[in-house]
């Protein structure tokens, strides 16, 4: 846990001092939201500052700075939800938004008095808050230029380098009709590099990057040169890549970035809204085996400085580590307030939204498989012929049945227990529950991906983290190679 000013208090002071949104104003808006007889109301105030600079082939291509602000107002009446938002924090605009959301409970016309109690956050999982947004543009450009020089110096075949840096500072305040007021100040940054290697007519590109819930201190851990050299290494590696073997073969998933396969192919099916609707492969299966007994999966929003971490969710609930699968047994789902009420469960701190313009839904934060008893060498050494997957560009999954397709960005052939030739971009085709049941070895080298993933669901994007130890899936379909 990082020692820093209480972000909840900081957020409350920010909205009170800048916009006059104090406890009295909040209580009045909540009363307006419940004026038509709603059971519960919630205000979600947001002020977000974004910045981005990109360098393309040694030229500054863009430099952007934007501010977005507003409030989303939700009213719950039975199983119905009314939602409205306004980009204006003017008192009259907010009152009209509250009245619009209130119409879901129209007909009761019950006056409601709200007693609000601000609360502080007991823990913060972010960095020291030395925000990139506080750095001059010239300092950010210097970081990009360092990456450009390092990638080009790595090998003469590097013909082009693109780099970008993005930062965000989001101040949120959640006020609820049960009296709770809680806020947060959420930093986020990301640094990306693309390198292009050219040998004759053979052109190969690779992209890498990282970031998290921190600021300039990220570069004390991973320098621009580190990121650039990794992108260059991957691009050069693809120059000598060969076709992947086709058909069903053993697949070793490397520690770290391979966790995106776990996130997409399995994690979404464990979000409670899909199970409430009966559209998930895991509906009504709590307490049942859903994976190999080597598999334990958690979703943990409390990992310090990770991209998916948050102090409180967007409903104001404290976040925590949630065990989803334990020893192959399904233990629970990820809940927001609505799904928790439906299942008679406690909220898991998983209610998230892209912004004040969007409704709440259960979402993952940092989704991880815990380490097992084997070593990475033992896992790889057990494979006579298969593939070793290090990183992915993303994929597609059918939530209802778990079928997925993923494309690798770095993968290798395994022959007689040894990693040999690099492979061209390769598609993995499979089924999430089936892949979990085929996990035959799990190593002790768990690693978290370095903060580059964003998850999309029903039109909403949120930052997430993924992690995995080295894992052997005894059989998975390799569905072809895309020539670079």
Please describe what each predicted stretch is.
Residues 1-484:
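N-terminal small-residue-enriched
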């Amino acid at each position: 846990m990082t020692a820093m000013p209480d972000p909840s208090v900081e957020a409350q002071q920010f909205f009170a001092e800048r916009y006059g949104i104090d406890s009295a104003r909040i209580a009045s808006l909540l009363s307006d939201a419940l004026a038509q007889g709603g059971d519960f109301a919630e205000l979600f105030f947001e002020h977000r500052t974004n910045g981005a600079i990109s360098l393309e082939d040694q030229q500054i291509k863009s430099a952007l700075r934007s501010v977005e602000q507003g409030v989303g107002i939700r009213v719950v009446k039975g199983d119905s939800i009314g939602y409205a938002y306004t980009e204006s924090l003017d008192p009259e605009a907010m009152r009209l938004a509250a009245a619009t959301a209130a119409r879901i409970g129209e007909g009761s016309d019950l006056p409601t008095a709200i007693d609000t109690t601000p609360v502080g956050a007991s823990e913060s999982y972010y960095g020291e808050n030395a925000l990139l947004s506080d750095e001059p543009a010239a300092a950010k450009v210097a970081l990009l230029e360092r990456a450009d020089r390092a990638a080009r110096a790595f090998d003469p075949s590097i013909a082009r380098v693109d780099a970008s840096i993005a930062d965000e500072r989001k101040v949120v305040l959640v006020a609820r009709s049960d009296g709770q007021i809680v806020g947060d100040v959420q930093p986020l940054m990301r640094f990306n590099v693309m390198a292009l290697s050219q040998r004759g007519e053979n052109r190969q590109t690779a992209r890498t990057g990282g970031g998290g819930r921190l600021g300039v201190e990220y570069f004390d851990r991973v320098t621009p040169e580190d990121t650039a050299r990794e992108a260059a290494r991957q691009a050069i590696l693809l120059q000598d890549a060969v076709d992947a073997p086709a058909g069903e073969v053993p697949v070793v998933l490397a520690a770290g970035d391979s966790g995106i396969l776990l996130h997409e192919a399995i994690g979404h099916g464990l979000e409670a809204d899909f199970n409430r609707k009966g559209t998930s492969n895991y509906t009504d299966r709590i307490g049942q085996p859903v994976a190999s007994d080597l598999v334990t999966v958690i979703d943990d929003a409390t990992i310090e400085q990770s991209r998916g971490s948050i102090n409180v969710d967007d409903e104001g609930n404290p976040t925590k580590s949630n065990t989803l699968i334990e020893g192959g047994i399904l233990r629970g789902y990820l809940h927001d307030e609505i799904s928790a009420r439906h299942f008679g469960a406690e909220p898991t701190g998983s209610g998230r939204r892209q912004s004040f313009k969007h409704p709440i839904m259960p979402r993952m934060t940092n989704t991880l498989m815990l380490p097992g008893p084997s070593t990475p060498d033992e896992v790889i050494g057990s494979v006579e012929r298969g593939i070793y997957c290090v990183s992915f560009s993303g994929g597609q999954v059918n939530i209802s049945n778990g079928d997925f397709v993923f494309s690798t960005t770095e993968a290798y052939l395994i022959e007689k227990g040894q990693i040999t030739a690099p492979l061209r971009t390769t598609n993995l085709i499979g089924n999430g529950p089936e892949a979990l049941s085929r996990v035959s070895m799990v190593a002790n080298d768990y690693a978290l991906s370095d903060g580059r993933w964003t998850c999309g669901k029903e039109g909403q994007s949120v930052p997430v983290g993924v992690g995995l130890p080295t894992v052997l899936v005894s059989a998975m379909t390799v569905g072809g190679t895309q020539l670079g």
